[in-house]
Design a protein with these regions (language model features):
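Primarily EF-hand calcium-binding motifs
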Residues: 1, 24-49, 85-101, 120-147, ...
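Amphipathic regulatory helices of Ca2+-sensor modules
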Residues: 1-25, 50-65, 103-120, 136-150, ...
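Conserved, structured regulatory domains from eukaryotic proteins
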Residues: 6-45, 56-66, 71-82, 158, ...
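Eukaryote-specific, cytoplasm-facing alpha-helical/coiled-coil scaffolding segments in long proteins
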Residues: 32-34, 38, 61-68, 115-119, ...
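Core solenoid repeat modules with strong leucine/isoleucine-rich periodicity
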Residues: 48-55, 63-69, 76-79, 83-109
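Serine endopeptidase catalytic core focused on the charge-relay Asp
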Residues: 154
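C-terminal interaction modules of eukaryotic adaptor/scaffold proteins
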Residues: 199-298
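A positional/structural detector of protein chain ends, strongest at the extreme C-terminus
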Residues: 302-305
C-alpha cells in the first residue's frame, strides 16, 4: 500500500507535461526516486514522518511543481524530479548491475565512482543492506546513496559517512581509523601517479584532518566535532575518496584528478548549499525523535513517508 507521500506525488503525475512519454520501466521507479529526495532533506532522522508544513514550504516541492512548466528537455536536466533525471538514474543502476539480479554487489558498486574506496563501500553495504539480499544494494537504497554522495555537506550525509568510518562503533574517529581507510586512498592514487606515495604522507594528512576538525579531545574526532567545525564533509571525504583527497590537496594550484573514464556516474542535481542548510535549519526546529512510525495515513501535522 502506498504511503502518504507516494500517494500525493502519484496524484500529481498526470499534471506534469515533462513526464509524458515516460517508459514503463522508469515509471515503476519514479516514485522511489521522487520520494527519496523529500525523505532525505525533510526526514533526516529517518523517523518515517515529515511535517506537512515543511513539505508545503520546501523548495523541493517547488522543484517538483516546476515540472508543470513548459521547458525544453535540456532545461529540465537540473531538476531531480524530471523524466531526464529519473531515466538517468535507472540507466545508471542497470549499467552497474552487470549480472542483472536487481542488486549491486561490492564489485558492481565499486564502478559507481572511481574515487570511493572499496573498504568504504564494503562498510556501506554492511551497514545499509540486508543479509537476505546477500548484503547487496537494491535500487531504492542506491537512490538514497546517490543523494548522500552528492549532498555531503548535509548533517545526514556527515552522519552516514561517520557511521561507516567508525568501524569499531566507538563514537569517534582516531588516527588508527584514519590510517586504516587512507591507505586504500593512497593505493588508488598510485594507479594514477606512480610517485603518489612520495608526494602524500599519511602523518601530514592526519595532522591536516585534526586541524580541520579541531576536536575537543585532541586524540579523537567525534560526530559533534564534525558538525561544529563546518568542514565535516571535507574531513570525511578525504579519508574515503581518492579524488576528493587529491582535489582538496591541490586546491590552491587548481589541479583536479580527471577520472571520468573510470566512473559511470555524472553529477545528479541536488539542492544548492544555501537551500540544503535552510532545510536543515527547518528540521532542527522540528525534532520528532522518539515518535513511533504511524500507520498509512496522515496524522494532522505529519505525513508518513
Amino acid at each position: 500500500m502506498p504511503n502518504d507521500l507516494e500517494s500525493f506525488i502519484n496524484e500529481l503525475l498526470p499534471t506534469f507535461p515533462n513526464l509524458e512519454g515516460i517508459s514503463d520501466k522508469v515509471r515503476e521507479a519514479y516514485l522511489i526516486i521522487a520520494t527519496a529526495k523529500f525523505r532525505f532533506f525533510l526526514d533526516p532522522r529517518r523517523t518515517g514522518r515529515i511535517f506537512i508544513k515543511d513539505i508545503l514550504t520546501s523548495p523541493i516541492l517547488a522543484e517538483l511543481y516546476d515540472l508543470r512548466s513548459e521547458k525544453s528537455p535540456e532545461e529540465f536536466l537540473s531538476n531531480w524530479f524530471s523524466k531526464q533525471n529519473a531515466s538517468k538514474l535507472v540507466e545508471l543502476f542497470d549499467q552497474l548491475d552487470e549480472d542483472k539480479n536487481g542488486f549491486l554487489s561490492i564489485d558492481e558498486l565499486s564502478k559507481f565512482q572511481w574515487g570511493l574506496t572499496r573498504f568504504f563501500l564494503s562498510r556501506v553495504l554492511d551497514r545499509y543492506t540486508k543479509e537476505e539480499n546477500n548484503y547487496e544494494m537494491d535500487f531504492k537504497t542506491f537512490v538514497e546513496f546517490v543523494l548522500i554522495i552528492e549532498n555531503r555537506k548535509t548533517r545526514q550525509s556527515i552522519l552516514f559517512f561517520f557511521e561507516c568510518i567508525d568501524v569499531f562503533g566507538k563514537g569517534y574517529i582516531d588516527a588508527f581509523t584514519i590510517n586504516m581507510f587512507f591507505k586504500e586512498v593512497m593505493q588508488k592514487l598510485l594507479t594514477k601517479d606512480s610517485e603518489a606515495d612520495k608526494n602524500f604522507h599519511i602523518e601530514d594528512v592526519k595532522d591536516e584532518i585534526f586541524d580541520m576538525a579541531n576536536p575537543s579531545d585532541s586524540k579523537v574526532i567525534s560526530l559533534y566535532d564534525l558538525y561544529k567545525c563546518g568542514q565535516g564533509d571535507t574531513v570525511l571525504s578525504i579519508i574515503v575518496d581518492a579524488k576528493a583527497f587529491f582535489d582538496y590537496d591541490q586546491r590552491e594550484l587548481g589541479n583536479t584528478l580527471n577520472v571520468d573514464e573510470d566512473s559511470h556516474f555524472q553529477i545528479i542535481p541536488g539542492l544548492n548549499d544555501d537551500e540544503e542548510m535552510e532545510e536543515e535549519d527547518n528540521n532542527a526546529n522540528n525534532d520528532i525523535l522518539g515518535m513511533s512510525k504511524p500507520a498509512v495515513k496522515t496524522y494532522g501535522k505529519f505525513a508518513e513517508v
